[in-house]
């Protein structure tokens, strides 16, 4: 049986969960070449038993992703339509549930035992393992311990701070992708009623680049495919995505596609286990057999080389079309539905294949094989995630990906399309509900008509802009609706200093995290219900809704007893805060919203495009799919009225002499900033997180050996002639299969290396996949 390296137990004296470990004791074994299997089942059950006990584990997992159950608080991969399997979850989904539904609690007594300074010295993993937050807490100026506060007093404190600001724009309101549609709608309504569009959210740090690129290309920032499209594609390209860890249920769909004859191309710097082979634990060959091979072609690309890859593929496709006109380019689609083809053709035929080889690190023969697979496919889906979105040229890269699909007419046809795979379970739904600093006029006008308010029109702060504003003293109140802002964001030292400049920080949270310890002069922790928790108002069970990565909207029903009677739902927190902030005469019916979420959904139906008759449609089994004009009717709501070919100068990430290009990534025991454990089973790491994966040739070149400990020092030219350096200390060197000149390490440990101002053009997403670093021996 799989055994964790960490030692955790509950202290008899303090009742704290010790969660002790020693980073120096980390061990490294060969990487795995298959994902899931029986071991994934064993780990799922082990984590459930540790956190929830047998009965609660059985009750929770039986309802996870079921039609009458709750949506997984992990990733945004969709449920398959129709009947559900008995176990409709993956290993990391089970871990997410175990973390949220744990029987451990963090009470007021816990905060009495531990000062903020003491807790600040604990690692993120230790903090999370203490359990669910059970009481609202306040830290006042001069105090060194959080102390209990009543809910009414907490609301009044926030309202007084907000109403005392000289401008609503001196407050920012952050959102995590866990927040439900109902809570997100109410939250943005509160914020716009207050008078600002300062609505940064977690999407700013991940798929903002996808939204920007797709909006330019096809007129909508969402993917165009369904589960059925993926299952019936001829060819699936998976670029910059690690489904085995980040979206494991996707592997089942890929398995079905393979059974239907699909070919799969994986494009990634690391040979991740889930890209190589999948052992489905619900099938015989996944238990006693060898499972299913995933990638027919593995393209081990250099970091930042994806734009060059797809530009090179575009050139080969265009050259094949010129040799045999009508054989490659879908002329009917391009002529009738696209703009900018001639400019794209001229630019792409000038792309040098030698340059493509240098930028990608692959051989011409492999590029030709991939091009041949694209030409042979009549139904192509291209999927991607952070490996494409977190580069300076991310928007241009995704435009290049879309160009290849447009050439072949692969938008708005069955079995084909774009598939940005979202990370957090409702991050796409939050945007649909209005969580964005620059919502379009159509949405704002509808909001104003429905509620009789006047929404501000000036764009607000995204995540990076919000940090800059706090840093510069232009924002003095920060409120986080979920998430772990201090650990999720770049440039840790700058971000933490920015938060500490605030007069008030408010965190609406399920569990203890670093953001509770990096605080303003006054700080509040407001404990909230999670997806798994039963939400009852006036004796009536409340339901919430979420939107997955493929625009399917469905209900989620928590069923477990909450951790305490002092925990409130996000909707209730928002609505009661609004009552304290605006008083009883406000035109928005906050009390009615707090008591009956159906009334919120009625308001959503009146405001949000595609959500008409929301209360009825969301109650249909499997829910409903939001409109997507390119998918539904080959209608492109762009500036040209057509799908636009993107034409950009070719960009990639050269490796400076004596340096490496570092990407930050998750371990298999991690979901965003939530650390489930200290092992990365697929990559062979056990018992620690401060490791850096480096090609053996680079290890030799730098005069190192595997097992050495080094500091990572990032170097960034700030555009004003200055060279900025940042340091992350004490990483174990691990020899690994990664392109020469490239390296990888886990976040949030490496977030201190990411400059706040090094962001993607157009999307302003931090560049976390192309950090220039040098290695120095740890002192």
UniProtKB/Swiss-Prot annotation:
One of its GO terms (cellular component) is plasma membrane. The keyword Hydrolase does not apply. Its cofactor is [4Fe-4S] cluster; Mo-bis(molybdopterin guanine dinucleotide). [4Fe-4S] cluster binds at residues 72, 75. It is an enzyme of class 1 (oxidoreductase). It holds the Pfam family Molybdopterin. Binds 1 [4Fe-4S] cluster. Binds 1 molybdenum-bis(molybdopterin guanine dinucleotide) (Mo-bis-MGD) cofactor per subunit. SUPFAM superfamilies: ADC-like (SSF50692), Formate dehydrogenase/DMSO reductase, domains 1-3 (SSF53706). Its EC number is 1.-.-.-. Gene3D superfamilies: 3.40.50.740, Dimethylsulfoxide Reductase, domain 2. CDD domains: MopB_CT_ydeP, MopB_ydeP. One of its GO terms (molecular function) is molybdopterin cofactor binding. Was identified as a high-confidence drug target. Belongs to the prokaryotic molybdopterin-containing oxidoreductase family. This is Uncharacterized oxidoreductase Rv2900c.
């Amino acid at each position: 049986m799989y055994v964790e390296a960490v030692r955790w137990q509950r202290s008899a004296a303090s009742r704290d969960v010790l969660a002790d470990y020693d980073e120096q004791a980390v061990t490294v074994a060969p990487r795995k070449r298959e994902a899931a299997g029986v071991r994934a089942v064993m780990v799922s059950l082990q984590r459930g038993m540790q956190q929830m006990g047998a009965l609660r584990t059985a009750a929770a997992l039986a309802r996870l992703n079921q039609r009458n159950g709750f949506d997984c608080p992990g990733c945004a991969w969709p449920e398959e339509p129709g009947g559900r399997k008995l176990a409709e979850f993956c290993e990391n989904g089970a871990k997410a549930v175990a973390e949220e539904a744990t029987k451990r609690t963090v009470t007021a007594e816990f905060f009495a035992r531990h000062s903020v300074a003491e807790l600040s010295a604990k690692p993120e993993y230790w903090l999370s393992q203490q359990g669910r937050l059970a009481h609202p807490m306040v830290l006042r100026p001069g105090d060194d311990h959080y102390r209990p506060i009543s809910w009414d007093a907490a609301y009044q404190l926030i309202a007084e701070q907000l109403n005392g600001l000289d401008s609503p724009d001196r407050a920012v309101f952050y959102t995590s992708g866990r927040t439900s549609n109902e809570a997100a709608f109410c939250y943005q309504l509160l914020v716009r009623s207050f008078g600002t569009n300062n609505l940064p959210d977690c999407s700013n740090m991940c798929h903002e680049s996808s939204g920007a690129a797709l909006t330019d290309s096809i007129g909508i920032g969402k993917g165009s495919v369904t589960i059925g499209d993926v299952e019936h594609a001829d060819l699936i390209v998976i670029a910059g995505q690690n489904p085995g860890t980040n979206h494991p249920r996707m592997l089942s769909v890929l398995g079905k596609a393979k059974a239907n004859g699909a070919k799969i191309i994986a494009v990634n710097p690391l040979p991740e286990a889930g890209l190589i082979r999948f052992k489905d634990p619900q099938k015989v060959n996944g238990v006693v057999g060898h499972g299913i091979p995933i990638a027919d072609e593995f393209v081990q690309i250099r970091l930042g080389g994806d734009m060059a890859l797809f530009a090179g593929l575009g050139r080969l496709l265009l050259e094949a079309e010129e040799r045999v006109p009508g054989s490659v380019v879908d002329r009917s689609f391009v002529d009738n539905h696209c703009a900018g083809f001639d400019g794209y053709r001229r630019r792409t035929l000038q792309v040098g294949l030698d340059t493509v080889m240098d930028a990608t690190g692959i051989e011409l023969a492999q590029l030709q094989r991939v091009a041949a697979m694209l030409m042979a496919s009549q139904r192509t889906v291209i999927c991607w995630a952070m490996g494409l979105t977190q580069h300076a040229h991310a928007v241009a890269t995704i435009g290049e990906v879309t160009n290849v699909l447009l050439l072949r007419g692969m938008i708005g046809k069955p079995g084909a399309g774009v598939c940005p795979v979202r990370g957090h379970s409702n991050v796409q739904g939050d945007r649909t509900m209005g969580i964005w600093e620059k919502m379009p006029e159509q949405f704002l006008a509808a909001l104003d008509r429905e509620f009789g308010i006047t929404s501000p029109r000036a764009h607000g702060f995204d995540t990076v802009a919000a940090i800059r504003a706090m840093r510069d003293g232009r924002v003095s109140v920060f409120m986080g609706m979920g998430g772990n802002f201090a650990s999720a964001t770049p440039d840790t030292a700058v971000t933490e200093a920015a938060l500490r400049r605030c007069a008030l920080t408010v965190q609406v949270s399920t569990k203890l995290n670093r953001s509770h310890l990096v605080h303003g002069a006054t700080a509040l922790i407001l404990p909230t219900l999670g997806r798994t928790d039963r939400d009852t108002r006036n004796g009536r069970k409340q339901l919430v809704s979420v939107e997955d990565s493929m625009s399917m909207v469905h209900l989620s029903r928590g069923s477990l007893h909450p951790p305490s009677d002092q925990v409130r739902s996000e909707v209730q927190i928002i609505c009661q805060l609004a009552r304290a902030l605006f008083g009883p005469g406000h035109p928005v019916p906050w009390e009615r919203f707090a008591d009956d979420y159906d009334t919120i959904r009625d308001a959503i139906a009146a405001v949000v495009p595609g959500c008409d008759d929301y209360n009825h449609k969301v109650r249909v089994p499997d829910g409903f799919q939001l409109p997507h004009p390119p998918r539904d009717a080959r209608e492109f709501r762009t500036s040209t009225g057509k799908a636009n070919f993107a034409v950009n100068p070719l960009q990639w990430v050269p490796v400076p002499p004596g340096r490496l290009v570092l990407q930050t990534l998750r371990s298999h025991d991690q979901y965003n900033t939530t650390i489930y454990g200290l092992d990365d089973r697929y990559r062979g790491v056990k018992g620690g997180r401060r490791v850096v994966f480096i090609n053996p040739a680079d290890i030799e070149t730098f005069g190192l050996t595997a097992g050495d400990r080094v500091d990572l020092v990032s170097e960034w030219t700030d555009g004003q002639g200055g060279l900025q350096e940042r340091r992350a200390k004490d990483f174990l060197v691990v020899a690994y299969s990664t392109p020469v000149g490239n390296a990888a390490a886990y976040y949030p440990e490496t977030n201190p290396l990411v400059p706040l101002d090094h962001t993607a053009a157009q999307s302003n997403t931090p560049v976390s996949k192309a950090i220039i670093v040098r290695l120095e021996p740890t002192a």
